Swiss-Prot record:
This is Large T antigen. SMART domains: DnaJ. The modification N-acetylmethionine is found at M1. The J domain is essential for multiple viral activities, including virion assembly, viral DNA replication, transformation and transcriptional activation. The LXCXE motif specifically binds to host pRB, RBL1, and RBL2. Phosphorylated on both serine and threonine residues. Small t antigen inhibits the dephosphorylation by the AC form of PP2A. O-Glycosylated near the C-terminal region. It comes from JC polyomavirus (JCPyV). Pfam families: Polyoma_lg_T_C (PF06431), T_Ag_DNA_bind (PF02217). A motif (LXCXE motif) lies at residues 105-109. Keywords: Acetylation, ATP-binding, DNA replication, DNA-binding, Early protein, G1/S host cell cycle checkpoint dysregulation by virus, Helicase, Host nucleus, Host-virus interaction, Hydrolase, Inhibition of host innate immune response by virus, Inhibition of host interferon signaling pathway by virus, Inhibition of host JAK1 by virus, Interferon antiviral system evasion, Isomerase, Magnesium, Metal-binding, Modulation of host cell cycle by virus, Nucleotide-binding, Oncogene, Phosphoprotein, Viral immunoevasion, Zinc, Zinc-finger. CDD domains: DnaJ. Forms homohexamers in the presence of ATP. Interacts with host HDAC1. Interacts (via LXCXE domain) with host RB1; the interaction induces the aberrant dissociation of RB1-E2F1 complex thereby disrupting RB1's activity. Interacts (via LXCXE domain) with host pRB-related proteins RBL1 and RBL2. Interacts (via C-terminus) with host TOP1 and POLA1 allowing DNA replication. Interacts with host TP53, inhibiting TP53 binding to DNA. Interacts with host preinitiation complex components TBP, TFIIA and TFIID to regulate transcription initiation. The modification Phosphoserine is found at S114, S121, S124, S660.
Length: 688
């Protein structure tokens, strides 16, 4: 090995390998150190390119020399090459052979006797070996409260602590300062080791800091952790038993460095208020709720909608939600807030459908309609009660004993008896079946479904009926073989495949998009269709069928009273509720709303007299504008069925009819078509 490299080259190679000079010639150790240094000094790893080249040159030269030294003929000679001893040739050969060894054979060193050699004896006990001090496994216990104990975490922090040896801490102090451009770094002594504390301008993972430091601590121990309480940790390192060795900022850190000025309190949207508004208005549309709530950000004192007072869902809640709506307008998660509110409405419906009886649910719906009537017909409302009573008169002429029809339907829907839950409205175009079905749907609350689509696409449409009080299968189409004017569709065929849904005997699976399936009894309801042929298997599912016929006087009267269509009075549940209040006795209503029904009967007696309503029906029968009559009050107030009386307005009509039954039909001023009750046009009372 002494001939492989000269002394300067061998010392340089050992320094580059990071090995002690005594390891020269230990090829396995040098090989391991060489591979390790290749990873550190490689330019792709951030190392020194010049050192890498020099180390490769010396190591390759050393390897080549070792191979030559291990060859069989290295250092040997042939006996025939040696001249005869004693001759001049032999002297010359001998000098040449020894000239390379002369400098290595001389050693200019003086040996001094040690104390152990002078005092020790031949039989003395050898000295004990020094015990190896174990490296620490963790930070000192008193610092644990300030450090993060997470081992495998992707959380990033900006303050770190490194626990290592004194020698490595000196190196890491400078390396970390350059590598991460630290805001602050300090080195503290503890026993024979050091603790580094530093703050970085950017956040890093603890594992990234640890991996970088491990490259510089091959044999030395290293513990790296994130710091949760920076100032408390730093102040602890500045007290005994720790000592400050050096720090990047003169005077160190102060407590106020970690206490920034308190920012202004961030205003946050009250999700609870938005949810409360959605529950009060029973809003199930995310975008509708978002739009209505954004309208609240305008000042209530300058709001035109509040001045008109035509939208109860707005002016009744504007002032309460004004402040929260201003914050809501600046929020970035408006849709998430509204989606949660709508989900809460659906959750409320789910709870009500499970815990409330159907009678209680209908009473709650009636209370909702009565509240709405109090608003729109109140002092701040803009609805005209007389126009809604005109709608009552028109609907009452649609079918004989309309109040009884509606009452029987409500009874059927509330009882919800299996196989006796669905009504069929059948008739030609423009006969009024859809108008009545829509009004009943609004009266009870529910959804309208379209089944005129392929059966495989019907699942999500049926899922609309989840947690609903009733449904309406609107305008169901058949084969169209009955008439060329009737279009064909899948409706009747699909309903025939949904017998379990119509019967209500067993629970069925309903599903919506992005929701789990819901198992429940499908809600009862109404089926409307034109004059299609209904199979016997489907006809057996209807407890009652009503055949509608178009009437010219109804169409003519409706065309003269456009407000009924413009304001959708005929399709409103409030119109049917007013019809029930006018015709049915108080005893037919639930006891929970008797007081409110009595109040409305009294109001109708004051504003709409029997004479006025009879004139409205007369105008309907003659195809005239319903409200085209002189506004004159009757001389006597007439009972509407509240208080001690159990009679209703329909009973009053029947008494009038019986009293005038002796008169012939020809003597009547007008006559409503066959099937309806005939009555005389009331005489105009004399002027007061």
């Amino acid at each position: 090995m002494d001939k492989v490299l000269n002394r300067e080259e061998s010392m340089e190679l050992m320094d580059l390998l990071g090995l002690d000079r005594s390891a020269w010639g230990n090829i396995p150790v040098m090989r391991k150190a060489y591979l390790k240094k290749c990873k550190e000094l490689h330019p792709d790893k951030g190392g020194d390119e010049d050192k890498m080249k020099r180390m490769n040159f010396l190591y390759k030269k050393m390897e080549q020399g070792v191979k030559v030294a291990h060859q069989p003929d290295f250092g040997t000679w042939n006996s025939s090459e040696v001249p005869t001893y004693g001759t001049d040739e032999w002297e010359s050969w001998w000098n040449t052979f020894n000239e390379k060894w002369d400098e290595d054979l001389f050693c200019h060193e003086e040996m001094f006797a040690s104390d152990d050699e002078n005092t020790g004896s031949q039989h003395s006990t050898p000295p004990k070996k020094k015990k190896k001090v174990e490296d620490p496994k963790d930070f000192p216990v008193d610092l644990h409260a300030f450090l993060s104990q997470a081992v495998f975490s992707n959380r990033t922090v900006a303050s770190f602590a490194v626990y290592t040896t004194k020698e490595k801490a000196q190196i890491l102090y400078k390396k970390l300062m350059e590598k991460y451009s630290v805001t602050f770094i300090s080195r503290h002594g503890f026993g024979g080791h050091n603790i580094l504390f530093f703050l970085t301008p950017h956040r890093h993972r603890v594992s990234a800091i640890n991996n970088y430091c491990q490259k510089l601590c091959t044999f030395s121990f290293l513990i790296c952790k994130g710091v949760n309480k920076e100032y408390l940790f730093y102040s602890a390192l500045c007290r005994q038993p720790y000592a400050v060795v050096e720090e990047s900022i003169q005077g160190g850190l102060k407590e106020h460095d970690f206490n920034p000025e308190e920012p202004e309190e961030t205003k946050q949207v009250s999700w609870k208020l938005v949810t409360q508004y959605a529950l009060e208005t029973k809003c199930e549309d995310v975008f509708l709720l978002m739009g209505m709530y954004l309208d609240f950000q305008e000042n209530p004192q300058q709001c035109k909608k509040c001045e008109k007072k035509d939208q109860p869902n707005h002016f009744n809640h504007h002032e309460k939600h004004y402040y929260n709506a201003q914050i809501f307008a600046d929020s970035k998660n408006q849709k998430s807030i509204c989606q949660q509110a709508v989900d809460t409405v659906a959750a409320k419906q789910r709870v009500d459908s499970i815990h409330m009886t159907r009678e209680e649910m209908l009473v709650e719906r009636f209370n909702f309609l009565l509240d709405k009537m109090d608003l729109i017909f109140g002092a701040h409302g803009n609805a005209v009660l007389e126009q809604y009573m005109a709608g009552v008169a028109w609907i009452h002429c649609l079918l004989p004993q309309m109040d009884t029809v509606i009452y029987d339907f409500l009874k059927c829907i509330v009882l919800n008896i299996p196989k006796k839950r669905y009504w069929l409205f059948k008739g030609p175009i423009d006969s009024g079946k859809t108008t009545l079905a829509a009004a009943l749907l609004d009266l009870c609350g529910g959804k309208s479904l379209n089944v005129n689509m392929p059966l495989e696409r019907l699942n999500f449409e049926l899922g609309v009926g989840i947690d609903q009080f009733m449904v309406v299968f609107e305008d169901v189409k058949g084969t169209g073989a009955e008439s060329r004017d009737l279009p064909s569709g899948h409706g009747i065929s699909n309903l025939d495949c949904l017998r379990d849904y119509l019967d209500g005997s067993v629970k069925v699976n309903l599903e919506r998009k992005h929701q789990n399936k819901r198992t429940q009894v499908f809600p009862p309801g109404i089926v409307t269709m034109n004059e299609y042929s209904v199979p016997r298997t489907l006809q057996a599912r209807f407890v009652r069928q009503i055949d509608f016929r178009p009437k010219a006087y109804l169409r003519k009267s409706l065309s003269c009273s456009e407000y009924l269509l413009e304001k959708r009075i005929l399709q409103s549940g409030m119109t049917l509720l007013l019809l029930l209040i006018w015709f049915r006795p108080v005893a037919d209503f639930a006891a929970a709303i008797h007081e409110r029904i009595v109040q409305w009967k009294e109001r109708l007696d004051l504003e709409i007299s029997m004479y006025t309503f009879s004139t409205m029906k007369a105008n309907v029968g003659m195809g005239r504008p319903i409200l085209d009559f002189p506004r004159e009050e009757d001389s006597e107030a007439e009972d509407s069925g509240h208080g001690s009386s159990t009679e209703s307005q329909s009973q009053c009509f029947s008494q009038v009819s019986e009293a005038s039954g002796a008169d012939t039909q020809e003597n009547c001023t007008f006559h409503i078509c066959k099937g309806f009750q005939c009555f005389k046009k009331p005489k105009t009372p004399p002027p007061k």
